[in-house]
């Protein structure tokens, strides 16, 4: 018997068939929800014919399309994260930037230099995700090219970086 329920204990999830606008969205690289239960999808290939315009698709909790934005703004959206106060952070791994947006797609600030990798140890070289702590500190994983975590103020000012490429063979 095939089950549509996954997980363990209090963390069990069930497949909801036919939820959302289309199963033909293309490459969805990440998903996040805001404090109003809106669902944000980061879509990489907007050339996919069934994908609505916009790189960020905003759905209601039932999967209906509410909004889309970001067309022609991103190279490769990789990670999306939304704070408790609905600040949206989007890491663009090919563009070497992390950007902060409002829920309606208004840019607040950009970290990194668009299209330019940071020097060794400096932000960014293909950032993958950003997250804001409860204390307002911003952390960015820069794993593809830097193998580092960068720490910033909540306004995007760099504080420090840590980590390095490992010397072992891995797992």
Predicted features along the sequence, with ranges:
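Eukaryotic scaffold repeat domains enriched in small/polar residues
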Residues: 1-171
């Amino acid at each position: 018997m095939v089950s549509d329920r996954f997980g363990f204990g209090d963390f069990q999830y069930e497949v909801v068939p036919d939820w959302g606008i289309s199963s033909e969205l293309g490459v969805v690289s990440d998903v996040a929800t805001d404090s109003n239960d809106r669902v944000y999808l980061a879509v990489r290939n907007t050339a996919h014919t069934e994908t609505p315009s916009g790189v960020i698709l905003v759905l209601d909790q039932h999967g209906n399309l509410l909004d889309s934005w970001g067309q022609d703004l991103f190279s490769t959206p990789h990670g999306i994260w939304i704070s408790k106060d609905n600040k949206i952070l989007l890491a663009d791994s090919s563009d070497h930037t992390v950007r902060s947006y409002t829920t309606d797609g208004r840019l607040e600030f950009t970290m990194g230099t668009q299209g330019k990798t940071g020097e060794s140890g400096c932000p960014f070289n293909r950032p993958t995700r950003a997250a804001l702590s409860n204390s307002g500190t911003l952390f960015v994983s820069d794993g593809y090219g830097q193998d580092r975590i960068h720490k910033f103020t909540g306004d995007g000012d760099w504080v420090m970086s840590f980590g390095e490429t490992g010397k072992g063979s891995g797992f």
